[in-house]
Amino acid sequence: VIYKTNLDLVQNLVQSLERTKSKAHVILSSSSQEDRDNLYGKSKKEGRVLLANWAQKTDTTFTGMIIPNVFGPFGHPYYNSVVATFSHQIANGETPKIEVDGDLKLIYVGELVSEMVKAIENKTNDSCYSVKPTAEAKVSELLSLLQSYKKEYVDNGAIPSIHNTFELNLFNT
């Protein structure tokens, strides 16, 4: 379902762009999961390639952003990121479970928006634009920080110790 849905969306967009003879600068947010052996990653990569082909054929600016794990306010639990899921679970008294304690490459949503604005201002024409992560952490580190923020801030009414921009952004999530 997700494979077909993602590709249908891009195909409909390309058809609309062609029908209207649009020369709009299109920015696609793809995923660092493009290279994983799953239907989500495959659909994201194929969608990006479809738009890149349209842009090349029509001599139009296209930025295909390959984005690391995004976190920040308004993330949806069980959908956007493990940060949103853990935050939701902790806030609701649930016990988060770590499936795989892997290393995550992360970017805060505000930092991602800045990257997108830069791409627009610079008219970045790159079908495979790799957005650099601004932080890296193990899943267990994220969980530990989020749990400590809840304990210190919510339970005890104290501002937790924040040591860097990543921790500030995580706290603001």
Regions found by a protein language model. Give the residues of each.
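Conserved catalytic-site region of short-chain dehydrogenase/reductase
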Residues: 32-39, 70-74
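Mid/C-terminal beta-alpha module of Rossmann-like enzyme folds, strongest
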Residues: 118-173
